[in-house]
Amino acid sequence: MSLTEACLFEFREKHMKPPFRSKQEVIINAPLETVWAFNMDITKIPTFHPRVIKVELLSGKALREPGVSYRCYLSGGKHMCVEKDIEIVPMQKVVTVLPEDTFGITKVLRDYVVETTLHRVGQSSTKIEISHYYSAPTLKAKLLNLIARRKIARETQDTLNGMKAAIEDRGASRTTRLA
């Protein structure tokens, strides 16, 4: 990537959101603060993401913050992706980009953005939503969108369901220990 392309990519990361593609959500029976803390810990990703077996902390930081990058190694052993958090609004939102992967997605969908938002639901529940944004300017990108859109949505929902189970099970085990 040339310096001009890198600068343009960084500008887009910070100032422009590509077109909306899909959104998945789940209600987790835990307070917003608990869900936020769990989601902020990058090392927890393999405990709830059904396809991630290992996370490498490229920035050396285990907690999310703008500019932190990490590599996710996927089950099957031959694929990985690098994710970078570019925006964090405490207790509300995390925006992540995908600068590198071995599937070739980043070569076709150059502006892929994932936005995770959290909303308090009553006193003890949290709605977490993951929205996907990317442009599909070329025929190849349009075809990839057509083919992969449902798979991305399904795998994202599986990830959210995994997070829900991990957080709720952790809460249940704490309650059991206290009893």
Please tell me what each predicted stretch does:
Residues 2-60:
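Hydrophobic ligand-binding cavity/cleft-lining segments
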Residues 3, 75-127, 133:
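Hydrophobic-ligand binding "helix-grip"
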Residues 8-9, 65-68, 95-102:
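Short Pro/Gly-enriched beta-strand edge/turn motifs at strand-loop
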Residues 23, 43-80, 87, 91, ...:
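Short beta-edge strand/loop motif at the mouth of beta-sheet-based domains
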Residues 34-39, 45, 70, 85, ...:
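Hydrophobic pocket/interface hotspot
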